[in-house]
Curated annotation (Swiss-Prot):
UniProt KW Plastid keyword: yes
Organism: Simmondsia chinensis
Job description of the protein: Usually encoded in the trnK tRNA gene intron. Probably assists in splicing its own and other chloroplast group II introns.
Single biological process term from Gene Ontology: mRNA processing
InterPro entries: Domain_X, Maturase_MatK, Maturase_MatK_N
PANTHER family: MATURASE K
GO cellular component terms, semicolon-separated: chloroplast
Record carries keyword tRNA processing: yes
Keyword terms of this UniProt record: Chloroplast, mRNA processing, Plastid, RNA-binding, tRNA processing
GO MF: RNA binding
Annotated HAMAP family: MatK (MF_01390)
Name this protein carries in UniProt: Maturase K
Location of the protein in the cell: Plastid, Chloroplast
Gene: matK
């Protein structure tokens, strides 16, 4: 946000909360394509292979306001440059520009709201791994969870209407609405059979902002009910909700259900209720009974349908018992298992041995899902046998090794908090042998001959930082190295789940 401060001070319109003039500023689109602002740090930044013009972007925005701009035939669309091969390029530029502009007031409000609060290293709470220590502390004492698949809004207008209470600049909202409808119509004209959604990977930033803004409208109700039904008001709930691409308004709670509010508060009064969300999947955990969780299930469905115009069905919400079922959340298989701890107690001449069960929140690497992802990315077969990757065979040897090594390190980095790391070493074996097969295919050699040629330098590319530390202390103290190997480490610099398919 420091980069935006200098520009915003020059715009008098910003002092009056007018965002519309920023849309025609070229530096906004330059910031949108800045690699420093790209929050997907684990994904490769791919630059555009074609040149683009900011002047064309302004002309496209102006064209949206012209009358009869939707009356276009198929022949006219083929002759138009924008409806040609550069359509996706410029539409993505406008969508990213919109996302940057609308994010500015939300980010500044969030920073100002946190100024008086004693939250240490708030940016660390944006990390995905910040959720897992919270789950370890809370979920081991709970019984049931609601595994919720959050429904998508059925209409674009619902997303736009959500911003009306946040952004008072009417021209910006009108332009955003025009762009969303216009882009939807362009895709329907060009691709009659294959409909391209506006929420594609090319427009992911704008979609995430609109989607999270919509979800926050009813997630703020959870914070409201929680604070009203409990005397111990949590200060971390707002921080956990205000994650990446997500800006909350904790001080401006929504006034809803005035008539039935006392009944709802009695229903929601549960001091052991916890809520966590990542993207379109959320978890509502409680120490209550199955009957209470079933009431929560139908309450959420009615809340979405009656008050937020979002269609949902009860079958999208599953009730799971933590001690019996595993939870598939954020790439981990999690459950609560009992560990029997033997305790010996001695009183005078008599001694007793007791087995004390201790609940522990366990996180496991889903090896089947990982193999499926590696298969989709063409690193191995369905059975997990490594294969070469012909797409990368034209690269330099150093680039091939670096790519495979980076994927391996990223996976180890993300799954460092797993309680069972044996599956990770199977993944490392697949990636390492796939790398060798790719190099052998490029040089038309055998795998055995190429392994002798590479030597130990090749293996160092696949070493993680944790393994390097273990190798240094292994010869000195074996017990310490074993504790580090079994230890669970959660990093606070990971803000997205890495998708292997993006490396194809």
């Amino acid at each position: 946000m420091e980069k935006f401060q200098g520009y915003l001070e020059l715009d008098r319109s910003w002092k009056h909360d007018f965002l519309y003039p920023l849309i025609f500023q070229e530096y906004i689109y330059a910031f949108a394509h800045d690699h420093g602002l790209n929050r997907y740090i684990l994904l490769e930044n791919v630059s555009y292979d074609r040149k683009y013009s900011f002047l064309i972007v302004k002309r496209l925005i102006t064209r949206m306001y012209q009358q009869n701009h939707l009356i276009l035939s198929a022949n006219d669309s083929n002759q138009n440059e924008f409806f040609g091969h550069k359509k996706n390029l410029y539409s993505q530029m406008i969508s990213e520009g919109f996302a940057v502009i609308v994010e500015i007031p939300f980010s500044l409000r969030l920073i100002s709201s946190l100024a008086g609060k004693e939250i240490v290293k708030f940016h660390n709470l944006r990390s995905i791994h910040s959720i897992f220590p919270f789950l370890e502390d809370k979920f081991s004492h709970l019984n049931y969870i609601l595994d919720i698949r959050i429904p998508y809004p059925v209409h674009i207008e619902i997303l736009v209407q959500t911003l009306r209470s946040w952004v008072k600049d009417a021209p910006s909202l009108h332009l955003l609405r025009l762009f969303l409808y216009e882009y939807h119509n362009w895709n329907s004209i060009i691709t009659s059979n294959k409909s391209i959604s506006i929420f594609s990977k090319g427009n992911q930033r704008l979609f995430l902002f609109l989607y999270n803004s919509h979800i926050w409208e009813y997630e703020s109700l959870f914070v409201f009910f929680r604070n009203q039904s409990s005397h111990l008001r949590s200060t971390s709930s707002g921080a956990l909700l205000g994650r990446s691409y997500f800006y909350g308004k904790l001080e401006n709670l929504v006034k809803v259900f005035t008539k039935d509010l006392p009944v709802i508060l009695r229903f929601c009064k549960d001091p052991f209720m916890h809520y966590v969300r990542y993207q379109e999947k959320s978890i509502l955990a409680s120490k209550g009974t199955f009957y209470l969780m079933n009431k929560w299930k139908y309450y959420l469905v009615n809340l979405w349908q009656c008050h937020f115009s979002v269609w949902s069905q009860p079958r999208r919400i599953y009730i799971n018992q933590l001690s019996k079922n595993s939870l598939d959340f954020m790439g981990f298989l999690s459950n609560v298992r009992l560990n029997l701890s033997v305790v010996r107690s001695q009183m005078l001449e008599n001694s007793f041995i007791m087995d004390k069960p201790i609940k522990k929140f366990d996180t496991i690497v889903p090896i089947i899902t990982m193999i499926r992802s590696l298969t989709k990315a063409k690193f191995c077969t369905v059975l997990g046998h490594p294969i070469s990757k012909p797409v990368w065979a034209d690269l330099l040897d150093s680039d091939i090794i670096e790519r495979f090594g980076r994927i391996c390190r990223n996976l180890f980095h993300y799954y460092s908090g797993s309680s069972r790391k044996k599956s990770l070493y199977r993944i490392k074996y697949i990636l390492r042998l796939s790398c060798v097969r790719t190099l052998a295919r490029k040089h038309q050699s055998t795998v055995r001959a190429f392994l002798k040629k590479l030597g130990s330098d090749f293996l160092e590319e696949f070493f993680t930082e944790e393994e390097k530390v273990l190798s240094l202390i292994l010869s000195r103290d074996f017990s310490i190295s074993q504790k580090l190997y079994r230890g669970r480490v959660w990093y606070l610099d990971i803000i997205c789940i890495h998708d292997l398919a993006n490396h194809s």
